[in-house]
Structure formats: C-alpha cells, structure tokens
A protein has these predicted regions:
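Extended recognition/assembly regions associated with phosphoester-bond processing machinery
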Residues: 1-36, 40-180
Length: 180
C-alpha cells in the first residue's frame, strides 16, 4: 500500500482490480501483452492462478521480484509465450526495446521516432525523476556550437500510470508526451 500510494486496502483487492483492468482491455486471446517484470511476488501456484485468469498471449521480461515464482517447481512457464530478461520487437514498423530496467543508451536510440525503449522497475520514484532528467537533457544536447537533439525515447511503463491496465505502444507514447 505504501509503495506508489496504491489505493488498495489489501493485496487481494489489488489483484482483483488489476485482473479486471487487464481483461477489460485485453479482449481476445490473440492480443499480445508484454510484461516488463515484477509480475508477481507470490509462489508458483499463486502466479499460475493469476495468469490463468488473464486473457491474451503473455510475454515476460523478468524483473527483480519475479525470481520467487520462476524458481518454484509449481510454476507453469508455458503460461507465457516466452520469458526473457531483454527483448527487441517491432510494432507497426517501430523498433521497441524491452527491459525491466531503463537503458539510457539503448540499441536504435538514434533512429528517432521509430525507436522506443520501454521499461518498468522505477515506478514513480526519485529514480524515475532521474531518468526523466536524463531524457530531457539528452534531447537538448549541445555539440560544439550547434544544438543537436537526441531522440531519447525512454518510456516508463509503470502500471500506476495506466490505472493498472495494459496499454498499446501508441497509448504509452501519448502518456509520455502528455507527462513531458
């Protein structure tokens, strides 16, 4: 409850709300959802139960809080399409780098608005403020006498920013632009 000032009295209340939000957005089992880590701090059987209630094809980028269920023999890894610590995918001709942790020098960052780095981990904390400061300063770099803008498209996909619902890349981009 204290982390991120989440509005839930209990973990069960939070889980119920997050599952409802997920299934409100993810309508079909062919919809793909990339989870950027810290999916569950529970045991394997608890994680299996939650995953079985969620629609769509699920992909996991591992986070620091996922190790408990990942190491549990009861965990059914087949509930995810894949489990990786890092991935690069494409979405409508845009390169998307996926990591639990923000990567300030990511593959493809000089490609402009066709390359994005999506991350989690930092929630809405001082670490996030530091990443935002880096992005803003990178976009206003000065090389010699000319001002040159780097397209530093790091997007914090903290679930609290989206009311705990999965979002499309376009939705995350719009939220990031509105926040800037």
């Amino acid at each position: 409850r204290q982390l991120d000032q989440r509005p839930f009295e209990t973990v069960e209340q939070m889980d119920t709300y997050m599952i409802e939000q997920w299934n409100r957005v993810v309508k079909k089992n062919r919809d793909e959802v990339y989870i950027l880590g810290d999916f569950c701090i529970g045991k394997g059987d608890q994680t299996n139960e939650v995953l079985s209630m969620l629609r769509g094809k699920k992909y996991l980028i591992t986070g620091n809080h996922d190790q408990r269920f990942l190491r549990d023999k009861q965990f059914d890894a087949s509930l995810f399409q894949w489990i990786k610590s890092y991935a690069e995918i494409h979405d409508n001709n845009r390169k998307v780098v996926l990591s639990h942790y923000p990567i300030i020098c990511y593959h493809g960052q000089y490609l402009g608005d066709i390359s994005y780095m999506l991350y989690g981990h930092v929630h809405d904390t001082m670490d996030y403020k530091n990443v935002r400061r880096f992005v803003q300063e990178s976009r206003q770099c000065v090389y010699g006498s000319e001002q040159k803008s780097l397209s530093c498209n790091l997007i914090n996909c903290f679930a609290g920013f989206s009311d705990f619902a999965p979002c499309t890349l376009d939705q995350w981009i719009k939220m990031e632009e509105e926040y800037s």
